[in-house]
């Protein structure tokens, strides 16, 4: 018996751990396929809560809960069979209170399910708050908001405690109720069985044996309350996990067409593109792009100019299909993006976003992310003016970076992400304000190196700095989501329109910054003389 019980425990616990392992892998694989709209509507803390607490609850349901339920069933059948052999009438009377078990289990089980779901939802909120504070720890300290954030977290934690206590109180009722039913059954057996034994219906020995079998039946039934609790928790958590598993990206290619091979860059064309970010049902969308049309021939460099909020980043996000436009279409080498195989499309694009995301790994590992070989990422580091900077680190390319590259400056992170994109040798290079944190001289050196690299890649550069676009083959000026001007740098300046206004504003900002630096230098000189 002991060996059998050990074998059952080993089998079920191993199986539950394996299910947890497979489910975690499946969840992560699904998350990697979901589009930007999903992550825009779902908090990171909520996802993390599902991958930890909910997954653990499912494991407990398919492991310990199944084990105790199996033990209850087999133990119950064994005990009832021997009780029937001793006295069927007394067995029926003993089992009479157990008729209430399904009713209680169903009613309280639903309440447990709902309360545990509420607990898990609030745990997601709590996790999100903690994650945001840890990610923004420097901002919290800089604004001296430590106490305010502690108070906010404490209020959320109080609510989490209250929901947990509500769940615990309900579960606390379930266990004694099952114990009460077991006690009633025991009282019936002692009263009626004792009377039957005194009248000689069966022997005292049979009465004692019957009582022992009843005890064997009662303890598993009392534990059934815990099993119901685990099953309801697991069901609620599995429902939350299915929300991820059932999610699908809306960006899969219609036909999955492969791109024809290309020696250099590719032709990118926007035809009457209109776009707004996804909004909840019933809300009015705010159009970010309206009727945008332009062509970037293979091997050309097109600049996208515009003030903050003009739609530059949204336009760039549409090319690798992080989102799809609601109006118009975008074509790559004459093929609509929606018809292309998504992996093949993105494999030929190097995208450097405004946010310089760096992984917690070595510089070499970050540069090699998606690169074909060491030679490619070493050359890319040189083009991005990063090689000399890396040479200053003691461990050079093996320097371990902190979370999100915390031990790098903003400019260093931008150059690292640029080098990472270049290392893929993409046919289309997208730079979305990718050099905003570097000085204008370094920016000019990088752009000059890209022009003289000798490859014929297509480049689309979005920037609020006009200086980054002056050498582009064609410039598109966005204003309020519309393409209001087209042309080369000199042509647009001669018109005196929106592009000219952007340049004048930039020159004014630069002159103020230069004046401030000169003023500081003058102060430093005067203090030295004094």
Q: For the regions a protein language model found, what residue spans apply to each?
A:
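Short active-site loops of ABC-family nucleotide-binding domains
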Residues: 17, 45, 49, 53, ...
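Transmembrane-helix motif of ABC transporter permease domains
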Residues: 1-21, 29, 40, 93, ...
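Conserved catalytic Walker-motif region of ABC-type ATPase nucleotide-binding domains
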Residues: 31, 153, 241, 270-272
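An intracellular "coupling" helix at the cytosolic face of ABC transporter transmembrane type-1 domains
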Residues: 36-37, 53-62, 66, 70, ...
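Transmembrane helices of ABC transporter permease
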Residues: 64-118, 189-202
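Helix-loop-helix
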Residues: 82-96, 166-239, 244-245
């Amino acid at each position: 018996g002991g060996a059998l019980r050990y074998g059952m425990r080993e089998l079920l616990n191993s199986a539950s751990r394996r299910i947890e392992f497979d489910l975690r892998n499946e969840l992560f694989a699904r998350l990697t396929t979901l589009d930007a709209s999903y992550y825009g509507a779902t908090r990171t803390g909520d996802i993390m809560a599902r991958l930890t607490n909910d997954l653990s609850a499912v494991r407990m349901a398919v492991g310990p809960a199944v084990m105790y339920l199996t033990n209850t069933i087999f133990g119950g059948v064994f005990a009832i069979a021997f009780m029937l052999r001793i006295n069927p009438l007394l067995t029926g009377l003993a089992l009479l209170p157990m008729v209430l078990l399904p009713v209680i289990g169903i009613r309280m089980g639903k309440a447990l399910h709902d309360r545990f779901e509420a607990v898990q939802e609030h745990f997601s909120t709590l996790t999100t708050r903690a994650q945001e504070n840890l990610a923004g720890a420097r901002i919290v300290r800089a604004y001296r908001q430590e106490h305010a954030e502690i108070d906010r977290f404490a209020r959320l934690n109080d609510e989490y405690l209250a929901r947990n206590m509500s769940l615990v109180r309900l579960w606390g009722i379930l266990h004694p109720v099952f114990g009460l039913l077991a006690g009633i059954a025991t009282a019936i057996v002692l009263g009626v069985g004792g009377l039957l034994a005194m009248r000689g219906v069966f022997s005292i020995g049979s009465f004692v044996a019957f009582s022992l079998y009843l005890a064997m039946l009662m303890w598993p039934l009392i534990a059934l309350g815990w099993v119901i609790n685990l099953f309801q928790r697991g069901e609620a958590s599995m429902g939350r996990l299915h929300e991820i598993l059932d999610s699908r990206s809306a960006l899969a290619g219609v036909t999955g067409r492969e791109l024809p091979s290309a020696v250099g860059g590719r032709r990118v064309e926007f035809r009457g593109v209109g776009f707004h970010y996804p909004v909840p049902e019933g809300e009015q969308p705010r159009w970010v792009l309206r009727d945008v049309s332009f062509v970037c021939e293979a091997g050309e460099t097109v600049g996208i100019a515009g003030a903050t909020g003009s739609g530059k980043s949204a336009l760039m996000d549409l090319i690798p299909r992080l989102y799809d436009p609601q109006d118009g279409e975008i074509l790559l080498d004459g093929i609509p993006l929606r018809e292309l195989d998504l992996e093949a499309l993105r494999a030929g694009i190097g995208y450097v976003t405004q946010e310089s995301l760096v992984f917690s790994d070595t510089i070499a590992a970050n540069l090699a992310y998606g690169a074909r070989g060491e030679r490619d990422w070493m050359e890319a580091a040189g083009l991005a003016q990063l090689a000399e900077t890396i040479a200053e680190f003691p461990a050079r390319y093996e320097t371990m970076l902190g979370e999100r590259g915390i031990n790098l400056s903003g400019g260093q992170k931008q150059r690292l992400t640029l080098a990472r994109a270049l290392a893929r040798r993409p046919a289309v290079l997208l730079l979305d304000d990718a050099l905003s944190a570097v000085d204008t001289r370094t920016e000019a050196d990088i752009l000059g190196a890209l022009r003289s690299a000798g490859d014929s890649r297509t480049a689309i550069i979005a920037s609020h700095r006009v200086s980054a676009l002056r050498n582009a083959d064609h410039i598109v000026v966005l204003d309020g989501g519309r393409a209001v001007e087209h042309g080369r740098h000199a042509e647009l300046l001669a018109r005196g329109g929106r592009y000219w206004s952007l340049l004048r504003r930039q020159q004014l900002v630069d002159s103020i910054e230069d004046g401030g630096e000169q003023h500081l230098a003058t102060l430093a000189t005067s203090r030295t003389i004094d």
